[in-house]
């Protein structure tokens, strides 16, 4: 043994050939701070080892190295710039040391080889993979960019254009593509991977492969003419500006880094990369996006714990109520391996549900995600039925009938008689209290809410609503089932609107009040989309949700929270509803809609809206962007905080993920609680108090006032690592 540490070991595997084996005690290998330090010492040991002819990098896991340890990022990023710069210099000195070994090096690449893992293998001379290999640099998705030499080495290995595509998109390449672009030198069968890599290294040792020339290319300036460079970088900047936009600076910074470093050799180019990385790491966007990644891991951990705690795994499911929503739920269940009965009282609805499932499967087929055989198998695992036959075998029932409490209660009561005492019943409702529906059941402990978002196949969030009598076993089984479906389940306690709709309607309330006071809804949409970063402004979102749906839900919320959400007379939603302007579904709402060539609705402003809104809106007046943002966001933020204060939602992490996954809250802001930490709770309280005359929606919750006085934050040190 040449060197041994907790996460890696170095030994001589044949005459003069040493193997660096990454072998962390965890389920995956990561380039955390400890592993980097061990790799540094391992390379020193190799340098001092006599008779060294070549070095192999291998992993004892299915994935080579999944990347750096993201749980350490926020702690590192919180350090002063000088310390962060020193850490990066240290990390880069390690990869330079690997690249500068006086012998050829080969990486044995399998499974996920991402981020720091990819940057590690880029420092080797040769890279051999198998068909499981997925290699890439996803850092821009976290608001940063490669900082271990990825912006320097990748363009020199595969060319600037391909490198910029991979880095700016945060893309991982499958083995075949990686081979085609030169990121891998060979792809072989898994059982031959080690032997092939060893043979490749032997060929390099025997000078059958010119590894020195390959290394020279990586450590020199990029070979681009002035014209080639101008065309390449100008085009890349244009594409990135169009796709990433102004709220996500990392992709553009990566392009600038590659451009600035192109004319320099490795060490100077690394200095440029380091300078830009530090700037990104200190940004609020990086803090928010890394925070979201950690929050996502947090809710996945909760789901895994629930699955382990559940006494029974869901093997079969049933959906009551077909149509688009029922078909979408059935499709998602079947796609993830849980056969499902889809029951309805109308054949036309069953046909619609099966058509929806077939349509979604055809899209998967067209994209090459599944083959015809698998498609047929998935479709066969959805059983449409007009009767309850076989439903007694279902472990979980998802009721997805019309949003009417009497109809839902009747259907749930009826199906309870058809199933065993262990069967879990759930209701896919967006507004009806779970405690109300539970009154119709003999076994309310086996019942909870399971709120899917539309379209089911795209929206990651599922709200799991705990009723007064819901048992822990029921929650555990439903959370586990939602996770099995590929969803992100978040448990909330019962209240009108649950969590997502409860916090959405004060936002719509702020919108209605702005219109009442003379604001232009098209300006509000532009500000909330372009400045704040929502995917849709409130008027457009209401049209997509459906004015009729929003009108109904608004009444439910007003009844549940009369002080904050009770209406003072008619508003814009009422006016449109009464004029039968329901939004996209009937072609006219705040905007008018026509279908484009692809069959997608395209919105346009029409003067016909003006007389409809006139009775409920003051004469138009100008509002500055900040006033619009404040008046829109304060009610939502206050309601989110109240939900945490009242225990409707358990944690800031779950709330922020629910907002991003369920409502499209701008990811670069990280969710409401991350946003509050970013702007400063005391600053938010002072800002909100300037608008308090607008009504109870603008009244700051006591929790925020107390936290502002104490100088507290929501995330504090709980997501901080240590350097």
UniProtKB/Swiss-Prot annotation:
Q: Which organism is it from?
A: Vibrio vulnificus (strain YJ016)
Question: What terms describe the molecular function in GO for this protein?
Answer: 3-hydroxybutyryl-CoA epimerase activity; delta(3)-delta(2)-enoyl-CoA isomerase activity; enoyl-CoA hydratase activity; long-chain-3-hydroxyacyl-CoA dehydrogenase activity; NAD+ binding
Q: Which residues form the active site?
A: 451
Q: What is this protein called?
A: Fatty acid oxidation complex subunit alpha
Annotated positions for site Important for catalytic activity: 119, 139
Kindly state the subunit structure of this protein: Heterotetramer of two alpha chains (FadB) and two beta chains (FadA).
PANTHER family linked to this entry: TRIFUNCTIONAL ENZYME SUBUNIT ALPHA, TRIFUNCTIONAL ENZYME SUBUNIT ALPHA, MITOCHONDRIAL
What are the top taxonomic ranks of the organism?
Bacteria, Pseudomonadati, Pseudomonadota, Gammaproteobacteria, Vibrionales
- One family from Pfam that matches here is 3HCDH_N
Q: Look up the record and report any one GO term of the cellular component aspect.
A: fatty acid beta-oxidation multienzyme complex
């Amino acid at each position: 043994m040449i060197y041994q540490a907790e996460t890696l070991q170095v030994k001589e595997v044949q005459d003069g050939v040493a193997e660096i084996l990454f072998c962390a005690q965890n389920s995956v290998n990561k380039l955390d701070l400890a592993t980097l330090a061990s790799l540094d010492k391992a390379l020193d040991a190799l340098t001092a080892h006599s008779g060294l002819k070549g070095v192999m990098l291998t992993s004892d896991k299915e994935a080579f190295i999944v990347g750096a340890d993201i749980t350490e990022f926020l702690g590192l990023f919180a350090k002063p710039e000088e310390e962060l710069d020193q850490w990066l210099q240290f990390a880069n000195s390690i990869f330079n040391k690997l690249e500068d070994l006086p012998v050829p090096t080969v990486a044995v690449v399998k499974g996920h080889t991402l981020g720091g893992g990819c940057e590690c293998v880029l420092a080797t001379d040769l890279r051999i993979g198998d068909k499981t290999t997925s290699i890439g640099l996803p850092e821009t998705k976290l608001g940063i960019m490669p900082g271990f030499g990825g912006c320097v080495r990748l363009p020199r290995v595969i060319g600037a254009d391909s490198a910029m595509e991979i880095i700016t998109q945060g893309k991982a390449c499958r083995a075949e593509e990686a081979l085609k672009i030169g990121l891998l030198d060979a792809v072989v069968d898994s059982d031959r991977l080690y032997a092939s890599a060893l043979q490749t290294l032997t060929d390099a040792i025997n000078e059958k492969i010119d590894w020195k020339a390959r290394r020279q290319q990586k450590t020199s300036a990029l070979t681009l003419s002035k014209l080639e460079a101008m065309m390449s970088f100008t085009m890349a900047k244009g594409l990135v500006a169009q796709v990433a936009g102004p709220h996500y600076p990392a992709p553009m910074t990566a392009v600038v880094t590659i451009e600035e470093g192109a004319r320099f050799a490795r060490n100077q180019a690394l200095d440029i990369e380091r300078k830009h990385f530090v700037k990104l790491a200190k940004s609020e966007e990086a803090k928010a996006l890394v925070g979201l990644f950690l929050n996502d891991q947090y809710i996945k951990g909760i789901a895994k714990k629930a699955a382990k705690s559940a006494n029974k795994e869901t093997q079969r499911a049933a959906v009551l109520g077909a149509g688009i929503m029922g078909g979408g739920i059935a499709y998602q269940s079947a796609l993830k391996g849980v056969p499902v009965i889809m029951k309805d009282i109308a054949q036309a609805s069953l046909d619609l549900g099966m058509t929806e499932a077939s349509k979604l499967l055809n899209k998967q087929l067209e994209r090459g995600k599944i083959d015809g055989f698998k498609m047929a198998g998935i479709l066969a695992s959805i059983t449409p039925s007009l009767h309850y036959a076989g439903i007694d075998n279902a472990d979980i029932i998802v009721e997805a009938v019309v949003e009417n409490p009497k109809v839902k209660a009747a259907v749930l009561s009826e199906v309870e008689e058809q199933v065993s005492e262990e069967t879990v019943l759930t209701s896919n409702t967006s507004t009806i209290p779970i405690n109300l529906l539970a009154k119709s059941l003999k076994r309310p402990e086996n019942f909870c809410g399971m709120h899917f978002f539309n379209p089911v196949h795209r929206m990651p969030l599922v709200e799991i609503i705990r009723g007064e009598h819901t048992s822990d076993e029921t929650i555990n089984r439903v959370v586990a089932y939602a996770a099995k479906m590929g969803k992100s389940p978040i448990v909330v306690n019962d209240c009108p609107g649950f969590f997502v709709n409860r916090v959405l309607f004060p936002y719509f309330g702020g919108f209605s009040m702005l219109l009442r006071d003379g604001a232009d809804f098209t300006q509000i949409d532009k500000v909330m989309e372009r400045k704040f970063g929502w995917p849709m402004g409130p008027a457009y979102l209401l049209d997509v949700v459906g004015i009729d749906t929003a009108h109904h839900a608004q009444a439910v919320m007003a009844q549940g929270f009369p002080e904050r959400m009770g209406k003072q007379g008619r508003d814009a939603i009422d006016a449109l509803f009464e004029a039968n302007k329901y939004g996209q579904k009937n072609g006219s709402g705040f905007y008018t809609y026509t279908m484009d060539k692809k069959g997608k609705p395209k919105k346009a402003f029409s003067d016909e809206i003006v007389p409809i809104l006139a009775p409920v809106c003051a004469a138009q007046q100008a509002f500055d962007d900040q006033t619009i943002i404040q008046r829109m966001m304060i009610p939502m933020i206050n309601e989110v905080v109240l939900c945490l204060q009242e225990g409707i939602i358990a944690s800031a992490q779950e709330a922020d993920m629910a907002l991003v996954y369920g409502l499209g809250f701008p990811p670069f802001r990280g969710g409401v609680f991350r946003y509050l930490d970013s702007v400063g709770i005391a600053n938010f309280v002072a800002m909100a108090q300037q608008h308090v005359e607008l009504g109870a929606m603008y009244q700051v919750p006591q929790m925020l006032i107390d936290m502002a006085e104490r100088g507290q934050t929501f995330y504090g040190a709980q997501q901080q690592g240590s350097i």
